[in-house]
Design a protein with these regions (language model features):
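Conserved active-site-adjacent core of cysteine acyl-enzyme catalytic domains
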Residues: 24-91, 97-115, 232-364
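Sec-dependent signal peptide cleavage junction
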Residues: 10-27
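Bacterial N-terminal signal peptides
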Residues: 2-12
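Short, solvent-exposed coil/turn segments at beta-strand boundaries
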Residues: 75-79, 87-89, 97-103, 124-128, ...
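Active-site-proximal structural scaffolding
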Residues: 2-3, 211, 302
Length: 364
């Protein structure tokens, strides 16, 4: 998944949130072209993000503030990103959207953080940022002579954003102080597995080898095979073309081979929350395949995406996952709905036609 950088223009303050006195001054406001955020999304974010930040996973966040939300410049865009500031700088984004069931959910991660911090110093009221997501899930940061001058390269969206008047330019800035949810004594059970993924050569989603990356991360963490790479794993199953994937069950077949001592189990369905929690608490990362519910293919594996469940906050029932498209982890409210950060066309569900490899012993 490539990132293409360039930027866009105009001005209007976001009208729905009243700014408060700040304890710390942010490095620079970010002017961005967006639709106004629905009130229910703002209420959800304000009521939820403190639950995430109250976990020991985020102990390094000492002065959190939530910022003005924005969305992509696509006409159909309905995922809103709330910048989460720490000591005046964007540290995370909290993306909020409605699931296929109509419920609101949120995901906290470092998605877009580096780009937003970089562009904030380059934007102003007359020269705002415009973010456009293409069908191939690439992002364009655009800077043009006018907000309407960027012609969409996406054949499905030939009309230009904002022509209906729904888009304005907002000043994205620190808005409300976040109060971290205080855990009762002994109530914070946050467990992180394989905290360092830098040894994995992440390809940022530019191929179909998500199972290979998930397998390599888990196998290296468990010391089952400390040298295997995603490429080597995929080659075991005759795959060298980056446009071809493999089934999650092949990780299971690898695990139960004689030289791996028979560790691992496979399920053609999703684990319950309790069973998933037991795996994490026992130090066993779980590989899952999530179904793209917007993909209508009936062929097994088509439209699926593999991620690793590698952390658990048992107090608020939040999981931490690693999507092999990214070099960071994500805290997620529910595994029933997952929309990647750089997408407007995909929604994955683990509970609907999910696959699971679990019981993976740590042999270190």
């Amino acid at each position: 998944m490539s990132l293409v950088c360039a930027i866009a223009l105009i001005f209007t303050l976001f009208p729905q949130i009243e700014a408060k006195a700040l304890e710390h001054t942010q490095t620079a406001p970010l002017y961005i072209y967006s639709k106004d955020c629905p009130e229910e999304y703002m209420e959800y974010a304000l009521n939820t993000v403190g639950d995430f930040l109250g976990s020991s996973e985020y102990n390094d966040i000492t002065d959190p503030w939530i910022g003005t939300p924005f969305t992509f410049a696509n006409p159909e865009s309905n995922i809103y990103y709330f910048p989460i500031y720490d000591n005046g700088k964007i540290a995370y984004t909290f993306r909020v959207y409605k699931t296929y069931t109509g419920d609101i959910t949120g995901i906290l991660s470092e998605a877009l953080v580096n780009d937003l911090n970089e562009f904030s110093a380059q934007t102003n009221a007359e020269n705002p940022l415009k973010i456009y997501c293409k069908d191939d899930d690439s992002i364009i940061f655009s800077k043009e002579d006018s907000p309407s001058s960027l012609s969409f390269e996406n054949s499905a969206n030939q009309s230009e954003a904002g022509m209906d008047g729904s888009f304005v330019v907002i000043e994205c800035k620190m808005e409300d102080k976040i109060e971290k949810t205080v855990r009762p004594r002994g109530g914070d059970s946050y467990i992180n597995l394989f905290p360092n993924i830098n040894y994995i050569d992440v390809q940022s989603g530019d191929n179909y080898w998500c199972v290979g990356y998930v397998a390599a991360a888990i196998l290296n963490y468990t010391k089952i095979d400390v040298t295997i790479t995603p490429k080597e794993f995929m080659k075991l199953y005759g795959i060298t073309d980056p446009k071809k994937g493999t089934y999650l069950r092949n990780l299971y077949y690898y695990l139960i081979a004689d030289y791996v001592k028979g560790t691992g189990k496979f399920s053609s369905s999703a684990l319950s929350f309790l069973d998933m929690a037991i795996e994490i608490e026992e130090g066993r990362p779980v590989a899952i395949s999530m179904r793209n519910i917007k993909n209508t293919s009936t062929e097994e594996g088509v439209g699926n995406h593999a991620v690793v469940v590698r952390g658990l906050d048992s107090y608020r029932a939040h999981f931490s996952i690693w999507n092999p498209w990214y070099r960071f982890y994500e805290s997620i409210v529910t595994l029933d709905s997952y929309t990647p950060a750089i997408s407007s066309t995909r929604e994955y569900s683990y509970s609907r036609d999910g696959r699971t490899v679990y019981g993976i012993k740590n042999l270190a």
